[in-house]
Swiss-Prot record:
One of its GO terms (molecular function) is DNA binding. InterPro entries: Homeodomain-like_sf, Myb_dom, Myb_dom_plants, Plant_Stress_Dev_TF, SANT/Myb, SANT_dom. Expressed in aboveground tissues, with the highest level in leaves. Signal peptide: none annotated. GO terms for biological process: positive regulation of DNA-templated transcription; response to gibberellin; response to salicylic acid; response to sucrose. It comes from Oryza sativa subsp. japonica (Rice). Residues 92-109, 228-241 have a biased composition (Low complexity). The keyword Transmembrane does not apply. This is Transcription factor MYBS1. One of its GO terms (cellular component) is nucleus.
Amino acid sequence: MTSQAATTTTTAAAAAAWTREDDKAFENALAACAAPPPADGGAPDDDWFAALAASVPGARSAEEVRRHYEALVEDVAAIDAGRVPLPRYAGEESAAPPDGAGAAAAASKDGGHRRDERKGGGGGYDGGKSCSKAEQERRKGIPWTEEEHRLFLLGLDKFGKGDWRSISRNFVISRTPTQVASHAQKYFIRLNSMNRDRRRSSIHDITSVTAGDQVAAQQGAPITGHQATGNPAAAALGPPGMKHHHHHHPGGAPPPMPMYSAAPMGHPVAGHMVPAAVGTPVVFPPGHAPYVVPVGYPAPPAKMHQ
């Protein structure tokens, strides 16, 4: 008799085991079939449990559904009374559970209906919404360095405003396009803000990729990306017409003689050479006929024979 009773108990326990799918189906049926208020303040009547069992797959009997319902009520009461410890999240120090928490967790009886099993996705909440300290530090963001900001200015001058993906891929490879766009927004807000003398210094005050950024920001036009020049240093050098050409003549030599003018006195001549009447070579304009009278410096007069 003892062996037969043990076998019967094991079979009943196996039949009473509820899977996660069974729990979900039971919860859906419980939400669809609202329990009528009992007259004596106790559990609902047998007819309601029979209707609830018909909505639960797996051929559960009304008695099994009743035990499962009572286990659920006990779990909810234990949680409301504070006898169930709250789940620990990443980064929090582990604390010993309060007294009676283990007994409350074990008091769910043979239904096997644990709150930590019921929430299913709630168990994923511990790993889904919570994150490690390293993940939290990464989400806080790492401040931009001056080198990254200068690379951003190079990319802004190259690809223009709005092409953050190209700037991220070709210049600021350590930042994502979203981070580049956020940095650009702060940069333009800083560029257009008022009261520049009163505000604190920031990396967004750097508006040029050359040395002396603070002076360049006050005297020259900052990089805005509206006109991509392809050469970041072109804005700092200025337009080609602003360059000054200084001609240095080594050795103190006189400047070269113009092409279409007469040779000055005592100046060596070169070019289209023809013999002059007085024996002095002169310069003729190219393409002119040789009958033009050359202009040369006067020769000393010949001595008169007496």
